[in-house]
Curated annotation (Swiss-Prot):
Alphabetically ordered keywords of this record: DNA replication
GO-annotated molecular function: carbohydrate derivative binding
SUPFAM superfamilies on file: SIS domain
InterPro entries: DiaA, GmhA/DiaA, SIS_dom, SIS_dom_sf, SIS_GmhA/DiaA_subfam
UniProt keyword Transferase present: no
Name listed for the protein in its UniProt record: DnaA initiator-associating protein DiaA
Source domain of life: Bacteria
Assembly behavior: Homotetramer; dimer of dimers.
Occurrences of domain SIS (ranges): 34-196
PANTHER family: DNAA INITIATOR-ASSOCIATING PROTEIN DIAA (PTHR30390:SF6), SEDOHEPTULOSE 7-PHOSPHATE ISOMERASE / DNAA INITIATOR-ASSOCIATING FACTOR FOR REPLICATION INITIATION (PTHR30390)
GO biological process, one term: DNA replication
Length: 196
């Protein structure tokens, strides 16, 4: 059992090292995309399923409340957080549309959709991205594996942060770290003197 525990830590560390080599440019571009949208008076919609939903909610909470230092609230909405909306849509057997309907209702040109999907193939996330494209939104996608169907939907203005792993647990861990990096970069760019 102890060896298995050590193996989990070792694999996680190795994934972090690989991500630290491969992802800084994509994370930087994603952060600047989010910052520019906020500076233009727009908002960030975010969504995910399971652990990815938790990461989406963590991002939205860190924008609305704060990340590590006090600062003004920033507009972000986790589309997976409203159980009444979610169950109303799924009750009509529109599972694949659970986020797309919200994107069409709430998204505007200049907004950003932060779409989090471990494999990039979740139908409801793919449909949300398709809806965001029709609304002239920019997409920041956090993926893993080969990026899945989601990666193929992204345009030149969009950013994919693909974790270099084929293990869901490692990808989800790195998605959380990436979300924290994005929050830190947004805060340090928009409020450079808040932590002094």
């Amino acid at each position: 059992m102890l060896d298995r525990i050590k193996a989990c830590f070792t694999e996680s560390i190795q994934t972090q090292i690989a991500a630290a080599e491969a992802l800084p440019d994509a994370i930087s571009r994603a952060a600047m995309t989010l910052v520019q949208s906020l500076l233009n008076g727009n908002k960030i919609l975010c969504c995910g399923n399971g652990t990815s939903a938790a990461n989406a909610q963590h991002f939205a909470a860190s924008m609305i409340n704060r990340f590590e230092t006090e600062r003004p609230s920033l507009p972000a909405i986790a589309l997976n957080a409203d159980n009444v909306v979610l169950t109303a849509i799924t009750n009509d057997r529109l599972h694949d549309e659970v986020y797309a309907k919200q994107v069409r209702a709430l998204g505007h040109a200049g907004d950003v959709l932060l779409a989090i999907s471990t494999r990039g193939n979740s139908r409801d996330i793919v449909k949300a991205v398709e809806a965001a494209v029709t609304r002239d939104m920019t997409i920041v996608a956090l993926t893993g594996y080969d990026g899945g169907e989601l990666a193929g939907l992204l345009g030149q203005q969009d950013v994919e942060i693909r974790i270099p792993s084929h293990r869901s647990a490692r990808i989800q861990e790195m998605h959380m770290l990436t979300v924290n990096c994005l929050c830190d970069l947004i805060d340090s760019t928009l409020f450079p003197h808040q932590d002094e």
